[in-house]
From Swiss-Prot:
CDD domains: KU80 (cd00873), vWA_ku (cd01458). The modification Phosphothreonine is found at residues 535, 715. The keyword Hydrolase applies. It is found in: Nucleus; Nucleus, Nucleolus; Chromosome. Induction: In osteoblasts, by FGF2. It comes from Homo sapiens (Human). This is X-ray repair cross-complementing protein 5.
Length: 732
C-alpha cells in the first residue's frame, strides 16, 4: 500500500468482472479477497486521521460512468467515488453497494481512467504523492496498443503503481507466496496457485511485470502483492500520523556557555485524537444538544447564584480555603521562558533506570545550519560518553509550564549523535515501601535445585536471540513494532458500530491475541523448564478450618457420662475441617493428607495409637528422604499433629522418644535445613507442665532445641583412644 508520509492522492481501481467471482470450493473468491483488502486499507486511512484523499474506480461493471467513455472506448468502467477524504460512507459503499458485475473490462483501460482521475482532480490541490492501486485477477482481455504511452505518462506525472493479484510471483509450485508467513490468516490463501493460472492470466502477468520493471526496475516486482499477503499486512489499523515539530531553545552551562539546540519528541504516549461527545440519540447531531450549567444554594428554595458570585475553594482536611483566580495566578511559578539548563554532572550509574518518569523522551540536536552549535554540542556529547557521565538538566517548555528536573545522556549512532532527555522524579513522586526479606525465614528459603530450575526457566524465556555468525542479538518480541491493542479494539468497535448500528460488538480479533502471545520459539524452549518447575514447586492445598457448631461437637454417642462428653468436646472442637466429613472412609494414614488421617484414626479409635503413630512416622521418613522443602513442610505438619494428639491421649513418652530419634537421623543424613525449620517453629519435647506423664522439664525441652557445639578434633581423639575424664581435664 502507499507509504505513509506527506499528503497523497490514491485511486483504488478494482476489477468486479464475472471472473473475479470464480473460486475453488472452500476458498474465498478473488472478488471477496480484493474487497477485504480495500476495506482494510480504507478503514486504516479513516482512523489514521491524515489528509490523504481516496477515489474508487470499478471496472467490469454492468454500466459505464467515466469521463473518457465514448463509442466503444473505455466501456464497463465506473468512477464510483471521486477524490476526497475517506469516511464511513465510503466503507459502507464498499461493503453493501459494490457487487460482482456480469461484464469484463480491459485493466489497462481502467488504469488510464484512474490516471485521468488523478490528473484532473488534483488540479488546485497540493499532493506530495500520486498513487494507483489495481486489484484484478488478470482474466479479462486487454489491448497493448497504448502500453508505451501509459508507461510514459506514469513517469511524467510521477504516479506510482501497485498491483494486487489472487496469486503471487512465487515459484512454479506456488510456494513462494509471501502470504505464507507465520501470521497468515486462515482461509485467505491465494485462490489460484501460480501453476494453475490460465494462459490469459499468464499473458496479463507478463504485461504487469513489464510495466513495473519499466517504472522502477527490478525493484518494481516488489510492488506486486498477493491478496493473502495484503490481508496479513493490513490486519492492524494504521497508526495515527504525527509530524515532528522541533522545540528551539538554548542549552546553557553556567552563565557564560550557551548552545543553540532543537529538541524533538522521540517517544510520546499516544492518545486518540477524536474524543467522545454527546449527541442527540435520534438525529445523532451535536448541535441538537444544549448544555446549561446552573449554580444553586443548598437551601429549601435552591436559590440560583450567578457565576460571577462564585469562587473556587481548596479543601484542606475538613476546612475549605477560598482561593480566587487572582490568587491562583499569583501562586503560579513565574519563569523567564523556555529553559534547558545544565545543573551539574554525575556518573551514569547514579541515575538508575527506575527513576525515569514522564510521558515523553526528547532527542536534543544542535540547531540547524549552526556549525558552532554543532561543534560545541558534539564536544559535550563525546565528553559525557568518554567519562561515562550524564547531565542533570532543568527543563521548562515555556514560561507557562512548571519546570522539571531531568537527565540528559549521550546517544551516539553511526549516522547521528544527540542528547536524550528523560524526566526525573521529585521527592513527592517517589513511593517508598518496606518489605521484609524472604531470606529471614528458613521455612520459605528455596533449595539449590529450585533456584537452578528458575534460572533455567528465565534463560529459556529470553526474548533476545544471538546470531552466532554476525555476533548480534535479534529481538524476538520487538514491542516498538506491536500496535497498541487498545487502539486496535477501539477502531474495530467504532467501525463495526458505524456500519452495523444495531448488531452487538464483535469479539476481539484473533491477530490481536496472536501479537501479544510470546513467540512460538520461546514457548517451545520453555516447556521442559516449566515441567521441572511444576515438579519442584508442588501445589499443596491449604485447607481452612471451618467454624465448629454446637451440634457437631455434642453429637449423639452411646457412651454416657461427663467423661465421654469431655473427651468429645476436646477432640471434636480442636481440629474440625471439611475433610472430617469423610472420616468414615479413613482406615490408614495416607501420603496425601497424613496429619489429618492420623487425627481421624486416633480420634475414632480405628487403630491403636501405636499403630497409627508408626504409620505416620513412616511417611515422615519418606518425606525427609526427598530432601525437598515442600515435603519438609508436610513433615512439620505431621510432627505437630503427632505432638498434639500425644498430649491428648497421654502418649507423651512415645512422642519424646520419636523426636529424639528423629534428631539423630537428621544429624546422620545432614538435613540441617529441615531441623532449622523445626527449631524455628519451636517443636520440642513434651514437658511435664504439658502432660503429667512426662519427666522432661521446660529447661530440658529448651536445651533440646539449642544448637550443639561440635567437639574439637583433640577431644574426639581422646575418646577414640580410650582416655578417661582426667585426661580430658588435663587437656583443658
Amino acid at each position: 500500500m502507499v507509504r505513509s508520509g506527506n499528503k497523497a492522492a490514491v485511486v483504488l481501481c478494482m476489477d468486479v468482472g464475472f471472473t473475479m467471482s470464480n473460486s475453488i470450493p472452500g476458498i474465498e473468491s478473488p472478488f471477496e479477497q480484493a474487497k477485504k483488502v480495500i476495506t482494510m486499507f480504507v478503514q486504516r486511512q479513516v482512523f489514521a486521521e491524515n489528509k490523504d484523499e481516496i477515489a474508487l474506480v470499478l471496472f467490469g461493471t454492468d454500466g459505464t460512468d467515466n469521463p473518457l467513455s465514448g463509442g466503444d472506448q473505455y466501456q464497463n468502467i465506473t468512477v464510483h467515488r471521486h477524490l476526497m477524504l475517506p469516511d464511513f460512507d465510503l466503507l459502507e459503499d464498499i461493503e453493501s453497494k459494490i457487487q460482482p458485475g456480469s461484464q469484463q473490462a480491459d485493466f489497462l483501460d481502467a488504469l488510464i481512467v484512474s490516471m485521468d482521475v488523478i490528473q484532473h482532480e488534483t488540479i488546485g490541490k497540493k499532493f506530495e504523492k500520486r498513487h494507483i492501486e489495481i486489484f484484478t485477477d488478470l482474466s479479462s482481455r486487454f489491448s497493448k496498443s497504448q502500453l508505451d504511452i501509459i508507461i510514459h505518462s506514469l513517469k511524467k506525472c510521477d504516479i506510482s503503481l501497485q498491483f494486487f493479484l489472487p496469486f503471487s510471483l512465487g515459484k512454479e509450485d506456488g510456494s513462494g507466496d509471501r502470504g505464507d508467513g507465520p501470521f497468515r490468516l486462515g482461509g485467505h490463501g491465494p485462490s489460484f496457485p501460480l501453476k494453475g493460472i490460465t494462459e490469459q492470466q499468464k499473458e496479463g502477468l507478463e504485461i504487469v511485470k513489464m510495466v513495473m520493471i519499466s517504472l522502477e526496475g527490478e525493484d518494481g516486482l516488489d510492488e506486486i502483492y498477493s491478496f493473502s499477503e495484503s490481508l496479513r499486512k493490513l490486519c492492524v489499523f494504521k497508526k495515527i500520523e504525527r509530524h515532528s515539530i522541533h522545540w528551539p531553545c538554548r542549552l546553557t552551562i553556567g552563565s557564560n556557555l550557551s548552545i543553540r539546540i532543537a529538541a524533538y519528541k522521540s517517544i510520546l504516549q499516544e492518545r486518540v485524537k477524536k474524543t467522545w461527545t454527546v449527541v442527540d440519540a435520534k438525529t445523532l447531531k451535536k448541535e441538537d444538544i444544549q448544555k446549561e450549567t446552573v449554580y444553586c444554594l443548598n437551601d429549601d428554595d435552591e436559590t440560583e447564584v450567578l457565576k460571577e458570585d462564585i469562587i473556587q475553594g481548596f479543601r484542606y482536611g475538613s476546612d475549605i480555603v477560598p482561593f480566587s483566580k487572582v490568587d491562583e495566578e499569583q501562586m503560579k511559578y513565574k519563569s523567564e521562558g523556555k529553559c534547558f539548563s545544565v545543573l551539574g554532572f554525575c556518573k551514569s550509574s547514579q541515575v538508575q533506570r527506575r527513576f525515569f518518569m514522564g510521558n515523553q523522551v526528547l532527542k536534543v540536536f544542535a540547531a540547524r545550519d549552526d556549525e558552532a552549535a554543532a561543534v560545541a554540542l558534539s564536544s559535550l556529547i563525546h565528553a559525557l560518553d568518554d567519562l561515562d557521565m550524564v547531565a542533570i538538566v532543568r527543563y521548562a517548555y515555556d514560561k507557562r509550564a512548571n519546570p522539571q528536573v531531568g537527565v540528559a545522556f549521550p546517544h551516539i549512532k553511526h549516522n547521528y549523535e544527540c542528547l536524550v532527555y528523560v524526566q526525573l522524579p521529585f521527592m513527592e513522586d517517589l513511593r517508598q515501601y518496606m518489605f521484609s526479606s524472604l531470606k529471614n525465614s528458613k521455612k520459605y528459603a528455596p533449595t539449590e535445585a529450585q533456584l537452578n530450575a528458575v534460572d533455567a526457566l528465565i534463560d529459556s524465556m529470553s526474548l533476545a536471540k544471538k546470531d552466532e555468525k554476525t555476533d548480534t542479538l535479534e529481538d524476538l518480541f520487538p514491542t516498538t513494532k506491536i500496535p497498541n491493542p487498545r487502539f486496535q479494539r477501539l477502531f474495530q468497535c467504532l467501525l463495526h458500530r458505524a456500519l452495523h448500528p444495531r448488531e452487538p460488538l464483535p469479539p476481539i480479533q484473533q491477530h490481536i491475541w496472536n501479537m501479544l502471545n510470546p513467540p512460538a520459539e520461546v514457548t517451545t524452549k520453555s516447556q521442559i523448564p516449566l515441567s521441572k518447575i511444576k515438579t519442584l514447586f508442588p501445589l499443596i492445598e491449604a485447607k481452612k478450618k471451618d467454624q465448629v457448631t454446637a451440634q457437631e461437637i455434642f453429637q449423639d454417642n452411646h457412651e454416657d457420662g461427663p467423661t465421654a462428653k469431655k473427651l468429645k468436646t476436646e477432640q471434636g472442637g480442636a481440629h474440625f475441617s471439611v475433610s472430617s466429613l469423610a472420616e468414615g472412609s479413613v482406615t490408614s494414614v495416607g501420603s496425601v493428607n497424613p496429619a489429618e488421617n492420623f487425627r481421624v484414626l486416633v480420634k475414632q479409635k480405628k487403630a491403636s495409637f501405636e499403630e497409627a503413630s508408626n504409620q505416620l512416622i513412616n511417611h515422615i521418613e519418606q518425606f525427609l528422604d526427598t530432601n525437598e522443602t515442600p515435603y519438609f513442610m508436610k513433615s512439620i505438619d505431621c510432627i505437630r499433629a503427632f505432638r498434639e494428639e500425644a498430649i491428648k491421649f497421654s502418649e507423651e513418652q512415645r512422642f519424646n522418644n520419636f523426636l529424639k530419634a528423629l534428631q539423630e537421623k537428621v544429624e546422620i543424613k545432614q538435613l540441617n535445613h529441615f531441623w532449622e525449620i523445626v527449631v524455628q517453629d519451636g517443636i520440642t519435647l513434651i514437658t511435664k507442665e504439658e502432660a503429667s506423664g512426662s519427666s522432661v522439664t521446660a529447661e530440658e525441652a529448651k536445651k533440646f532445641l539449642a544448637p550443639k557445639d561440635k567437639p574439637s578434633g583433640d577431644t574426639a581423639a581422646v575418646f577414640e583412644e580410650g582416655g578417661d575424664v582426667d585426661d580430658l581435664l588435663d587437656m583443658i
